[in-house]
Amino acid sequence: MNILTGTQRTSREKKKVKKLNLLVLLGVFCGVGAVGDADVKVSDALSQSILSEPRIRVLLLSESTTALVEAKGAFSVFGDGELLRVSSQGQRCAAHALYGGIRWGENYPNVECLKIEPLDGSASLFVNGIQYKGSVYIHKTERNCLFVVNELAIEDYLKSVLSVKYLKELDKEALSACVILERTALYERLLAGNANSFWHVNAQEDRYGGYGVTSQFYGVEEAVDWTSRLVLDNPEGLVFNADYLLQSNVDRLAIEGYNARQILEKFYKDADLVVIESWEDNNRGV
């Protein structure tokens, strides 16, 4: 039962919640990443071990005839999972689907999917003029069109989509509480998604604008970093809703001295604050 709205999950949804619990609590059962009973603020820097950075794949373009893809800095190119090229210099070219492969600067015959990956942190990728973190996949369809997908760290994705949602100042503890709920809801969506689809979410539907929109000066980037990989878990399968916190004047609680954990406990009394140690989507490999 959702204690906020009174809605009940279906048995199918509860099974998905159990799957989320198993993935999220892996590190907690091993004694890694559990949040103790001490009165610690989420905004305090947390040192959290990590096995693999959880990543998300975002559909940028669907059934497009071309896409302008630019790599600024050193990059590598993979074709259907095999390393094809390494370049120390950038490249800016239109990508096209060929009858026998994909073209981006040069022809890649018999390739159905190109992956362009920066080689270091100073390199960056652009698709149709928009900057993105992570890697870019270019898929060729049966109709000789392109799907373009951005793969990046979930934490970086949250910084982007939440920067265009939270456009007014909130106390850092109130904002941190909202970010934890937003992250929890995102993981629920990922686990409930179509296992046969290469991408997880749609950029247009999620208002994902890439890396450039993250610097909005409202504290979202800091709140995501402060709460890195923290989610709420509850065996009863609650529906977590950050919008409800905003409607409930969560900023007032923070001003009164509540930290992020205490704020969440007021709304979700039986939920636990846990850290995602790793998350892998084995159904969407290339």
Swiss-Prot record:
Could you say which protein family the record assigns here?
Answer: Belongs to the chlamydial CPn_0389/CT_041/TC_0311 family.
This chain's source organism reads Chlamydia muridarum (strain MoPn / Nigg)
Name under which the protein is recorded: Uncharacterized protein TC_0311
